[in-house]
A protein has these predicted regions:
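Primarily recognizes Gram-negative and organellar outer-membrane beta-barrels
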Residues: 1-388
């Protein structure tokens, strides 16, 4: 059998926010107003093919294909103040009010921004499952395979103007930052995994399960960025926003777009991940209770190549993740049930976050990698009792 699905979405979100910070005395009050429009279409086609060569063997094949495209346009205003701006005005983000508050020495910074983005993604893959029963007591062996390939691209135009009222330039004027960038990012992804699971009945209602899974992930991204932050202020003020209308902005630039290529903001990255996953589980099914306990050990090797901010990176990381699990369900009666769930999980920091690179493309949101980031271990425990 098979299925086909199409989904269309439209979004219009207008948000306003007022914040008072009781920790920082400088810039204790902030306001923002944002308008975000979105639209998207997605298509998904799936098939299911099943074959039973005999009564003990079951083979399933599930091909799937998908396509999606999404548009976004966003505009926003924000400002930070030394005092509550609503004492002076009901509209603290208006340009006239900001000028009045600036004269009173209340302004810390202000920002106006807009962006237009488009993304397109295509993927194809298939899943294979082969299950073989070895006896009537529950002994069986299962082979799972999965291959998926995706190809995507995105275009993004972003423009921001930041005014720092308490930071002066060499001439004693307020510092003003203008950031105008256009980027194109093609991305390719490969994912392949294979899993072999063996279940052995120990005694009636009790099973031991051993599983091994190998996963290979590959991702390649090559973002090309053009920076035209040095153009005259107000060049794009008369351009109306619209979906995919970046050419209306780029057409106002002098010369060719290639003249504005920015190597330091462009980014090439290649990521390969080899994951071995070994699981050992114990399962007990009785009349009044069920018990599941197990542990997963996951050694993995990651290879990461990146060219960004004029820094070349070529590194390899080897880590081991551990995840114990415990689930218990006891049925006192038809109306009363007790459930206990526990799961522990090791999490590794993203390799890009470990690089000692400073990203100051947004003066109000400067990011810096931390090579000293350590793995984390999360414990999740849930106790649930139900009766009626």
């Amino acid at each position: 059998d098979g299925s086909a699905r199409w989904n269309h979405s439209d979004g219009d979100v207008h948000s306003t926010q007022s914040i008072e910070n009781f920790v920082n005395k400088s810039g204790a009050f902030s306001n923002s107003d944002n308008h975000n429009y979105t639209r998207g279409d997605s298509y998904d086609v799936r098939f299911k093919l099943e074959w039973k060569p005999d009564t003990l063997t079951d083979i399933l094949l599930r091909p799937q294909f998908s396509y999606s495209e999404n548009d976004t346009q966003n505009s926003g205003l924000s400002a930070t103040y030394n005092d509550n701006p609503y004492i002076y005005s009901d509209n603290p983000l208006s340009s006239s009010v900001i000028e009045e508050l600036k004269a009173e020495g209340m302004m810390v910074n202000s920002r106006s921004n807009c962006s237009v983005a488009y993304s397109e993604s295509k993927s194809a893959g298939t899943k294979l499952q082969i299950n073989r029963k070895l006896n009537k007591m529950g002994r069986n062996i299962t082979l799972l395979g999965n291959v998926i390939y995706s190809d995507s691209k995105s275009n993004n135009l972003s423009m921001a103007n930041v005014h720092l009222y308490q930071v002066k330039d060499r001439l004693g004027n307020d510092s003003i930052y203008q950031t105008n960038r256009y980027s194109m990012t093609p991305t390719k992804n490969w994912k392949t995994d294979a899993q072999l699971t063996y279940s052995e009945p120990l005694w009636r209602g009790t099973f031991l399960q051993l599983s091994y899974k190998f996963t290979y992930n590959y991702k390649k991204s090559d973002r090309v960025t053009y920076d035209f932050s040095d153009v005259e202020s107000g060049l794009f003020d008369n351009v109306s926003m619209g979906y995919r209308n970046w050419n209306s902005y780029l057409g106002l630039l002098q010369g060719n777009l290639s003249d504005y290529y920015d190597k330091s903001q462009s980014c090439y990255s290649e990521y390969k991940n080899y994951i071995h996953e070994i699981q050992l589980g114990f399962k007990m099914v009785k009349k009044n209770y069920n018990l599941n306990a197990g542990v997963m050990v996951q050694p993995q090797t990651s290879k990461f190549i990146q060219e960004y901010r004029n820094v070349s990176t070529d590194t390899v990381r080897n880590v081991v993740n551990v995840s114990p699990t415990f689930e218990f369900k006891y049925k006192f009666s038809k109306q009363s049930t007790l459930r206990i769930n526990y799961r522990g999980m090791t999490s590794q920091p993203d390799m890009a976050d470990l690089l000692d690179i400073t990203d100051d493309s947004d003066p109000l949101n400067i990011k810096k990698g931390n090579p000293g980031l350590k793995p984390s271990f999360t414990n999740n425990f849930r106790l649930f009792y139900n009766t009626y």
